[in-house]
């Protein structure tokens, strides 16, 4: 049970900005990396990761599943992050992805989304290129805006993704 002072306005992690939505999402979704009770980074959907000066690689746990039993894949992160940066999404927290190569230019509509420095090399390997060295990217990857979104489910909601509980697919620990 979670005690909230208000109903979350919507639970689309790519667009959420309020505390109520963040609290619910933190209990129902899991990103590549999570925080433990001592605010230390721990594996989330990623079994392991490597941060380099020029980018990062994340290896997805094969047992990571969505609430419908389908596997969580690197493609789900690529889709979500591309959606955050799509100018038509108008995500207020898009800037938090700007360490990713070409993210700001994609978000401003100056480059096509295909130029974004994130790609699923396979279902279990996500590769990220940086604009500049970002040694704290592991901390960013734990933020709600970096949560995965499965494209086929998103498309099936006809623009209502995250508007109601049945319009959201969960991958969190509960």
Per-segment meaning from a language model:
Residues 14-24, 72-75, 140-146:
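Short Gly/aromatic-enriched secondary-structure transition segments
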Residues 48-96, 127:
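Aromatic- and charge-enriched surface segment that lines or borders ligand/interaction sites
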Residues 129-174:
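Gly/Pro-rich hinge or "lid" segments in bacterial periplasmic/extracellular proteins
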Residues 15, 60-68, 114-117, 164, ...:
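Second-shell loop/turn segments in exported
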Residues 49-52, 109-112, 119-122, 167-168:
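Extracellular/periplasmic catalytic domains that process cell-envelope and extracellular macromolecules
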Residues 33-37, 61-65, 82-90, 133-135, ...:
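Sec-exported extracytoplasmic/periplasmic mature domains
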């Amino acid at each position: 049970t979670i005690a909230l002072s208000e109903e979350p306005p919507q639970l689309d992690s790519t667009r959420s900005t309020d505390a109520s939505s963040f609290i619910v999402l933190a209990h129902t979704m899991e990103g590549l990396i999570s925080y433990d009770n001592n605010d230390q980074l721990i594996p989330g959907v990623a079994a392991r990761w490597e941060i380099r000066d020029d980018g990062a690689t994340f290896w997805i746990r094969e047992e990571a599943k969505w609430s419908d039993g389908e596997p969580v894949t690197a493609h789900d992160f690529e889709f979500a992050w591309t959606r955050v940066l799509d100018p038509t999404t108008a995500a207020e927290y898009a800037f938090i992805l700007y360490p990713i190569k070409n993210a700001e230019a994609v978000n401003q509509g100056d480059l096509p989304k295909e130029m974004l420095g994130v790609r699923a090399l396979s279902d279990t390997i996500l590769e990220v290129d940086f604009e500049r060295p970002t040694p704290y990217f592991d901390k960013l990857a734990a933020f709600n805006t970096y949560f995965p979104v499965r494209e086929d489910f998103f498309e099936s909601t006809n623009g209502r993704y995250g508007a109601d509980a049945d319009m959201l697919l969960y991958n969190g620990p509960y």
